[in-house]
Regions:
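Periplasmic/cell-envelope proteins involved in peptidoglycan metabolism and beta-lactam response
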Residues: 1-359, 467-474, 656-689
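Beta-lactam-recognizing serine transpeptidase/beta-lactamase-like catalytic domain environment
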Residues: 273-286, 299, 329, 336-390, ...
């Protein structure tokens, strides 16, 4: 507080004290007598033994003592205000002359591995206002009509208490320029309403990689509460901390959500001077906002687009070849040497730009309709399916390891297997039978009875009755792979304990694990569930001799303020995800030979299509059977066979046989990678499943 103000206050107190003194003196306790005989004026007299002068002096002494005490107290208070609490009162005074406005930070971009922007920002306009605007109902309703928003929504945004009372509150974002022009041209109708520059997300390649990139949206109350708990105790928004307010835009899915802490910037502050009416008269200071970091992904845009195009084409092929219910599917392409995801597609796709500025109820319902195809679902990591015959290479390794099926063992396939008795007979997918099959030819021709024999042997093996499940889990099935994306599915490897607890309404006898259950999972049927990503990771192990790495999409983060790389992938992907133990090199060689024969020996169609590629490809098809639906088509492979650089796993829901439709996804993606498109006109055949 200034010395001038101190003097003024002291003067006012002095005047008040004098007035009080005069009043008190005039109201003394005097008694008056009158000389009625001589008509003289009244004479003041005091009590007995006292004079008026003595009484006056006493009262004056008391008065001066009181006034002195008042001045002493005032002096102490003024000293405290000026010397001890001067900073506090100065801030209080300044707060009545200034307003602090938070400024949003620009969100970081998302790039592919070559620096191509997959998500960037574009300028946009927002309507903002101070909280006291809420007191003018007529104005709020007028503004709501102009913005095309419900009155309650506008009022709620203005009254939002997560932003400071003197901060500008965001009422609407990404406002059309025609609306902005109207507000500016009729500024007199909207006192206190302002237009602010903002940025919104922009997707240069539309729906490309939508399930990986995700989308953004306004922070929910639950998210805001959670974020506030994380930053509780941090009162200074400019102290290098990410803070959140109602109305903020945050990641809601995909990379946008998983790496929110990197993409979100640190808001700034701008202090402005205002007059008594609240009008801005100048600048008082500013703390600039810090943009979020750019994230570089492992994705290669060329491979990503190839995955999406190949998947869509295969689905259309399935529709034209008798599978009219085809429409959904997924594909994963990764580098087996480090776990980097090079491409990942899920069908159907969605347009992430529909979430900018808020998604309508109709669109949200359409995207989440239980009867629809769930376009928001990333089937590559969240879709869970029967693995079908793509799991047979792992079954073969399990049989070889535990001795339930040896390399020299044979099975006579007649098309109908009765290993558990005629009443429990099972068909091979090829009803005419394959004849005599070894384990290698069983893989090549996908002969079911070979694996029925193996499943039966496991069930009756007293030492390793669940050795098959043990191997599946060792190769990463039945648990998440650990990818850095939200909502990864764990799949399921059924066993006796699971069956007992799952079918609670069944009889005790029906809840028991039986030999039929084991023969089912040996061929990838029954209650087994896997994701396309899990199968890609399993085939990563087949390509690498058992080595598997954590699949990931993050490559590095680059600071926007010129600091360079914020940090790179922490190396977790360079460590083994798990030890997929292989009993011997000869076991792996047998399985790989079987996968070679799938493509180049057992099927003339596959040989025709893949034979035009320079690198050799090892793989396995699969055809899942689900009651009441068409067959599910699978194909998993890696290439080049002698030095694997790419692993691809794909599934088409109700898309037919794996060697008929799904194999085209793998062939087309490899064709783009190697610049060798599929020129074969050979139609799919059913010689392998």
């Amino acid at each position: 507080m200034s010395s001038q103000m101190t003097v003024i206050i002291a003067g006012i107190v002095l005047v008040v004290a004098i007035v009080v003194a005069l009043v008190v003196m005039r109201r003394g306790d005097s008694r008056f007598t009158y000389d009625t005989q001589h008509g003289t004026a009244p004479r003041a007299t005091e009590g007995e033994g006292n004079t008026a002068s003595t009484a006056f002096k006493g009262r004056f002494s008391i008065l001066t003592t009181g006034v002195g005490a008042m001045f002493a107290a005032l002096a102490v208070k003024l000293w405290g205000m000026q010397m001890v609490s001067s900073d506090y009162y100065e801030k209080q005074a300044n707060s009545n002359q200034t307003r602090t406005v938070t400024t949003p930070a620009v969100r970081g971009r998302i790039l592919d591995r070559n620096g191509v922007a997959l998500v960037q920002n574009r300028p946009s306009l927002a309507v903002v206002a101070y909280r006291d605007l809420a007191e003018d109902e007529v104005l709020v309703r007028h503004l709501a009509n102009v913005l095309g928003m419900p009155y309650v929504a506008v009022l709620r945004n203005i009254q939002d208490n997560t932003e400071g009372a003197q901060s500008l509150h965001t009422i609407a974002t990404d406002v059309r320029r025609s609306t902005v022009a109207y507000i500016q041209e009729h500024a007199g109708e909207f006192p206190g309403v302002k237009i602010a520059e903002r940025t919104e997300r922009q997707y240069p390649y539309g729906e490309t990689a939508c399930h990986i990139l995700g989308y953004t949206g306004t922070i929910t109350s639950e998210q805001l509460e959670a974020q506030n708990k994380k930053t509780s105790g941090d009162d200074d928004a400019s102290a290098g901390k990410i803070t959140y307010q109602s109305g903020d835009i945050v990641g809601q899915a995909g990379v946008e959500s998983y790496y929110e802490n990197l993409l979100q910037g640190i808001r700034g502050e701008q202090t402005v001077k205002v007059d008594a009416s609240g009008n801005v008269t100048g600048q008082a200071g500013a703390v600039p906002a810090k943009a979020g970091s750019d994230i570089k992904l492992t994705l290669d845009l060329k491979i990503q687009q190839a995955c999406e195009t190949a998947l869509a084409s295969a689905i259309e092929l399935a529709k034209t070849t008798g599978y009219s219910n085809a429409g959904n599917g997924a594909v994963v392409c990764l580098d087996p040497n480090n776990g980097e995801i090079l491409g990942m597609a899920s069908q159907p796709k969605f347009d992430p730009s529909v979430f900018i500025g808020g998604v309508s109820n109709d669109v949200w319902t359409e995207l989440n309709d239980d009867k629809g195809s769930h376009p928001l679902l990333n089937r590559a990591i969240s879709g869970q399916y029967m693995s079908a015959s793509t799991i047979k290479p792992l079954s073969a390794l399990a049989g070889l390891e535990f001795g339930t099926y040896t390399s020299g063992q044979t099975t006579n396939c007649t098309g109908y297997w009765t290993g558990l008795g005629k009443s429990w007979g099972k068909y091979c997918w090829l009803h005419s039978g394959h004849g005599t099959m070894t384990l290698q030819s069983g893989i090549a021709n996908s002969c079911d009875p070979v694996f029925y024999d193996m499943g039966k042997a496991f069930f009756y093996d007293e030492q390793h009755p669940e050795g098959l499940q043990e191997v599946f889990r060792r190769w990463g099935l039945g648990k998440t792979c650990g990818i850095d994306l939200p909502s990864e599915g764990a799949g399921r490897i059924p066993d006796a304990e699971w069956k007992e607890s799952y079918f609670t309404d069944a009889s005790a006898e029906d809840r028991k694990w039986n030999a039929g259950d084991m023969t089912n999972i040996a061929i990838g049927q029954g209650d087994i569930l896997v994701t396309p990503l899990q199968m890609a990771c399993a085939y990563m192990g087949l390509a690498n001799g058992g080595k598997q790495y954590v699949p990931h999409v993050f490559l590095s983060a680059v600071s926007r303020d010129g600091d360079g790389d914020a940090y790179k992938y922490n190396g977790k992907g360079k460590k083994k995800r798990l030890e997929a133990k292989i009993n011997s090199d000869s076991d792996l060689a047998l399985v790989r030979n079987g996968m070679h024969d799938v493509i180049y020996t057992a099927s003339t169609s596959l040989a025709a299509h893949f034979g035009t590629l320079t690198p050799q490809v090892y793989g396995k098809s699969g055809t899942g059977e689900k009651s009441g639906e068409d067959e599910y088509a699978w194909f998993c492979a890696y290439a080049p066979a002698d030095d694997p650089k790419y692993v691809i796993a794909t599934v088409l829901e109700q898309g037919g046989g794996g060697s008929d439709t799904a194999m085209h996804v793998v062939r087309d993606v490899l064709g783009v990678i190697y610049g060798e498109p599929d020129t074969s006109s050979a139609s799919g055949d059913s010689s392998v499943r």
